[in-house]
């Protein structure tokens, strides 16, 4: 079958395209711009067009699109004209799973699902279970970064941003939490959002939930939490190199967890994984070994650069909700106790910024300095009055030293550089390009430019 993927450079879309390509289908696609994923897919022999055009056409049998691709996209218009079936990525992904008929491990929720999915995959690989993995991020130990083909169970990250996720029926499901992100896709109805989690839980053999989550804790056959749940934490210690935690089960000391990845949130992610595998009757000794070896996912507190001479760090992180940002900054302050923390934050989606107005500033005030950029639209229509300046204004009202930079290409030129500083480039958009340009500029100059943010301060 010949399949045309519209938006093939997306992290979720490219994983599905890889699966179909490696299973013998004739795959090609298009993307709005060149990305690391499009370059990688090309190296494997997948033809890719950039940008979108009605001429990007090899007479496919099927067209797959992401929700971000609008119906007036020229390739979608042509597909309709030529009566070629068009399917949403998530719908098609469910069809793949039905076709595979394998044991399914799924992770969904607002925060932490990529890292938790990666942990589950890493454990199964360590146990020699040969999983097929679909990941919403890049993990070095997966053959293709966000995808690996195996002959064992299927592990996948299930995006709750689309209500259709409730139509899946994995054997085992971890719900990290449910904070109402993407509520606009549920008609801004919290009850409809809650019902989607309830529906998928009814279709699942074993559900693991965060005991302290208001919307989904009651859905868990097994729960985990800080002080509440089947699996809880008695104590935790952390250093720059590792962190340890004592885990209790039903109120009794059960085991010790060691992690190389930093952050209290990652202890909770690992606790969910322990709850899952213990409930399934796995020997926990190799599970704990795998978790201790786990090295994380790209753009999750990823140290992109360190100059030991000046003790300057540049870290990339995908955090884009207030809770994720709060977790990130708490981790940064724990790991870098004596360094200044500067956050460069790119808000992601107008709808999220409008809904979370004020919450971003509350999370960001944990940093020493904050630079806010304009919103990365993620193909949303711009909303009047919704701008990154909202966060900047809120930070200023909280008495925080903050700056606003409207044009992203200018960002790395105006970020103040000083010794003993950690620069966190944060967001789910294209802020990573600014991170790289900042490092390039720093390496070429090795100077300390004066602050030139002028009236934006």
From Swiss-Prot:
Pathway: Cell wall biogenesis; peptidoglycan biosynthesis. It catalyses: UDP-N-acetyl-alpha-D-muramate + L-alanine + ATP = UDP-N-acetyl-alpha-D-muramoyl-L-alanine + ADP + phosphate + H(+). GO terms for cellular component: cytoplasm. The keyword Cell wall biogenesis/degradation applies. It is an enzyme of class 6 (ligase). Keywords: ATP-binding, Cell cycle, Cell division, Cell shape, Cell wall biogenesis/degradation, Cytoplasm, Ligase, Nucleotide-binding, Peptidoglycan synthesis. One of its GO terms (biological process) is cell wall organization. Its EC number is 6.3.2.8. Pfam families: Mur_ligase (PF01225), Mur_ligase_C (PF02875), Mur_ligase_M (PF08245). One of its GO terms (molecular function) is UDP-N-acetylmuramate-L-alanine ligase activity. ATP binds at residues 109-115. It is found in: Cytoplasm. Cell wall formation. NCBIfam families: murC. Belongs to the MurCDEF family. This is UDP-N-acetylmuramate--L-alanine ligase. It comes from Thermotoga petrophila (strain ATCC BAA-488 / DSM 13995 / JCM 10881 / RKU-1).
């Amino acid at each position: 079958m010949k399949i045309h993927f519209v938006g093939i450079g997306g992290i979720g879309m490219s994983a599905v395209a890889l699966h179909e390509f490696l299973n013998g289908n004739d795959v090609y696609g298009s993307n709005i711009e060149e990305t690391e994923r499009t370059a990688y897919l090309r190296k494997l022999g997948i033809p890719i067009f950039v940008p979108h055009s009605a001429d990007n056409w090899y007479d496919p049998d099927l067209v797959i699109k992401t929700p971000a691709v609008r119906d007036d996209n020229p390739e979608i218009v042509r597909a309709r004209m030529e009566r070629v079936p068009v399917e949403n990525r998530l719908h098609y992904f469910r069809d793949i799973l039905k076709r595979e008929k394998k044991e399914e491990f799924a992770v969904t929720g607002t925060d932490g699902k990529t890292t938790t999915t990666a942990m589950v995959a890493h454990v199964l690989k360590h146990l020699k279970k040969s999983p097929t993995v679909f990941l919403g991020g890049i993990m070095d130990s997966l053959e293709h970064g966000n995808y690996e083909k195996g002959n064992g169970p299927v592990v996948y990250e299930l995006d709750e941003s689309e209500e259709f996720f409730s139509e899946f029926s994995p054997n085992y499901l971890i719900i990290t939490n449910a904070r109402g992100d993407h509520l606009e896709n549920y008609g801004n109805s919290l009850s409809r959002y809650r019902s989607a989690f309830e529906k998928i839980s009814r279709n699942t053999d074993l559900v693991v939930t965060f005991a302290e989550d208001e919307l989904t804790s009651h859905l868990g056959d097994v729960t985990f939490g800080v002080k509440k749940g089947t699996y809880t934490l008695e104590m935790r210690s952390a250093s720059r190199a590792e962190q340890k935690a004592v885990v209790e089960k039903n109120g009794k000391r059960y085991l010790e967890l060691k992690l190389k990845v930093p952050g209290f949130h990652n202890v909770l992610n690992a606790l969910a994984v322990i709850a899952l595998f213990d409930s399934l009757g796995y020997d926990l000794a190799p599970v704990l070994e795998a978790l201790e070896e786990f090295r994380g996912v790209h753009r999750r507190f990823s140290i992109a650069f360190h100059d030991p001479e000046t003790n300057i760090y540049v870290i990339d992180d995908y955090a884009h909700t207030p809770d994720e940002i709060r977790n990130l900054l708490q981790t940064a302050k724990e790991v870098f106790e004596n360094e200044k923390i500067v956050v460069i934050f790119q808000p992601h989606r107008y709808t999220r910024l409008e809904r979370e107005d004020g919450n971003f500033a509350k999370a960001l005030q944990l940093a020493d300095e904050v630079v806010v950029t304009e919103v990365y639209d993620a193909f949303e229509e711009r909303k009047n009055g919704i701008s990154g300046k909202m966060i900047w204004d809120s930070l200023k009202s909280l008495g925080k030293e903050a700056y606003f930079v409207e044009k992203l290409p200018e960002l790395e030129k105006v970020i103040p550089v000083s010794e003993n500083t950690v620069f966190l480039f944060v967001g789910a958009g294209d802020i990573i390009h600014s991170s790289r340009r900042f490092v390039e500029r720093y390496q070429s100059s090795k100077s300390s430019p004066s602050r030139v943010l002028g009236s934006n301060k």
